[in-house]
Amino acid sequence: MTNTTGVMPAPAAGGGFRLRYPVFAVIVAMMAYVVYHNERFIIDATNPIWNHYEPFKWWLLPHGLAGGCALVLAPLQFWESLRQRHTAVHRTIGTIYVIGVLILAPVGLYIQYQDEAQGAARSFTIETMIQSSTLVICTLFGLYFALRRQFTYHRQWMIRSYAVALTFFEIRVILGVFGLDHQPMDWHTLETVVWSCVASSVLVGDIANQIYESRLVSSRQVTRSARVAVAADD
């Protein structure tokens, strides 16, 4: 796999690459579900979940704002036309994403540590430390390669980073759809779901990278064949 110091060319807009549209649709659907199912308590001061969050409720504000910005804006970074035609916007959104990750990860770890007083196991705090560290490491690698203008590696690491970040939605969707998020919380079930999502997140990111690379190779082969055909006609 070669690296590049220029703007990454987009795969041809063939039918196969339109796989990105259902992927983005699934992400949007997860966002909508989590906002409706899990986050409505934000506008309902009488929701009993506030009793659980009371010891660390003010830490939820920076954690939620930073995480919301990162998760909502990140899909725009993978939109080819935006990335290639509006590089300043791409860099701005990328900066917001990196800052968001560097806020949400340590704050989330602190919140989970405080949650031990509510019955969460220390092993869950350790899991959150691994999850947060994985997210930060992938993001910082992506930033490092962006600063070095090695955009292939930058894209690969940012895809891994976002795959880890998406576990926020995946965990809540799985718990909600299968009715596992009832109160009082079964911490063993929750931790199992969280570990499963986190353990597979980088793998999911690498699968996405492989799909992108295979589409890119196919696009280059088609372009090369077309050029050869045109040259032969001339």
Predicted region positions:
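Alpha-helical membrane insertion/targeting regions
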Residues: 2-234
